[in-house]
């Protein structure tokens, strides 16, 4: 565990809750003190769901500390079983309640004897892993639980080409849009989708996972452990190349073809898809990104520097797109997924000047300040850093704020995703003529303190000391302070604003 003002990846219980609330008819109970139960509000705000988030807090308070948690935890499990009739209840502690070192697994075993639904304890080390690792582990645990429970499995794969998409979940960065784009891609390739988990899936679905011919893992962060388990237990091949960008899209499609050819079972398909012709047609005519990268607009980016930072999947993919497909220099790229550092380094070693593996936003901010790039592509934190340094930033990875949970269709994967990324890159830079005009006219985004007054009265003159004092006031109240001070000065018949006048105005308005 780590005490920090801000973190890229949240605590482990958030990952477990994300997986639980992605499945249909699954309820999560977190054994937590007040303050750790913010997930419900966060998910409702960002995902803008109509339904309530299926998560309940079993509060750790002074009574629990005095008597122990067993009765309260078991009672909460049985109450939710009766009220919601879920297929599964997942119990998880938080990093705070884990300090109590209670045997919650024993409480789950006791409750599962009495309850009508299945109950499992999230087997996650809250001291060692973060939100992403916990989500990956919890999904694998749920799949393993239901496959172990189904002793007699129909091991025959489907006659038609089929796939499981593993790793689409709630609060994922553009995950729902990406899922729609993957559906369209697989339909074009005449591949039937067997299961999509966990988002929108039922916990009864995992027992049918082995029927698919292969598994597709769009993001390394969640789903890879499940795919590796299915590969080990059932010999199912999996594709983990993220279909982001024209080059990796082509590579992903070729790996899909290779995975379909692995199994000896004959494929009965209504049509034979020429994969190479499909790649060529989509790259040349559907995706506008390939054409755009050769246009004069994209050539204007030559020589401009960028910094990329995000989760391993998105940071690596965006770095390769910028350097390989758009010819933009990536001065530094990095990820906060320290557990996946080796894979990340291998992916981007030929596409950037330097790399950073850290979960400390201050280090990232220092690098951005040193490099002074023309644009940043990162998370919500890099967006804040960019605003402070007056550098434009495109958000390409979680964690993100509500503006990146768009209602409109904005995938990052697939051929439509290449268009979205090209737009994001183009709009994140100051355009060529815009740069030129800013130089000529000394910039339109002046740092001078502006007034919003429509009055025709002559404004009092601010002396250098008072201007410096005004500049120290936070921006969100600065204009109001300026207007109130000038109004006070006019009422007193003063032509000059000094620091003393500012203090007098403040006292008069207090």
From Swiss-Prot:
Looking up InterPro entries in the UniProt record yields: ChlB/BchB/BchZ, LI-POR_suB-like_C, Nase/OxRdtase_comp1, P-CP_red_C, Protochl_reductB, Protochlorophyllide_Rdtase
Q: Which residues bind substrate?
A: 432-433
As its record notes, the protein acts as a catalyst of: chlorophyllide a + oxidized 2[4Fe-4S]-[ferredoxin] + 2 ADP + 2 phosphate = protochlorophyllide a + reduced 2[4Fe-4S]-[ferredoxin] + 2 ATP + 2 H2O
Enzyme Commission no: 1.3.7.7
Q: Name one GO cellular component term.
A: chloroplast
Free-text comment on the cofactor: Binds 1 [4Fe-4S] cluster per heterodimer. The cluster is bound at the heterodimer interface by residues from both subunits.
> Which molecular-function annotations from GO does this UniProt entry contain?
4 iron, 4 sulfur cluster binding; ATP binding; metal ion binding; oxidoreductase activity, acting on iron-sulfur proteins as donors; oxidoreductase activity, acting on the CH-CH group of donors, iron-sulfur protein as acceptor
Tell me the residue numbers annotated for binding [4Fe-4S] cluster. Answer: 36
GO biological process terms held by the UniProt record: light-independent chlorophyll biosynthetic process; photosynthesis, dark reaction
Q: Where in the cell is it found?
A: Plastid, Chloroplast
Keywords for the protein's UniProt record, in alphabetical order: 4Fe-4S, ATP-binding, Chlorophyll biosynthesis, Chloroplast, Iron, Iron-sulfur, Metal-binding, Nucleotide-binding, Oxidoreductase, Photosynthesis, Plastid
Pathway(s) of this molecule: Porphyrin-containing compound metabolism; chlorophyll biosynthesis (light-independent)
Cofactor(s) demanded: [4Fe-4S] cluster
Q: List the catalytic residues.
A: 297 (proton donor)
Q: What does this protein do?
A: Component of the dark-operative protochlorophyllide reductase (DPOR) that uses Mg-ATP and reduced ferredoxin to reduce ring D of protochlorophyllide (Pchlide) to form chlorophyllide a (Chlide). This reaction is light-independent. The NB-protein (ChlN-ChlB) is the catalytic component of the complex.
Q: What is this protein called?
A: Light-independent protochlorophyllide reductase subunit B
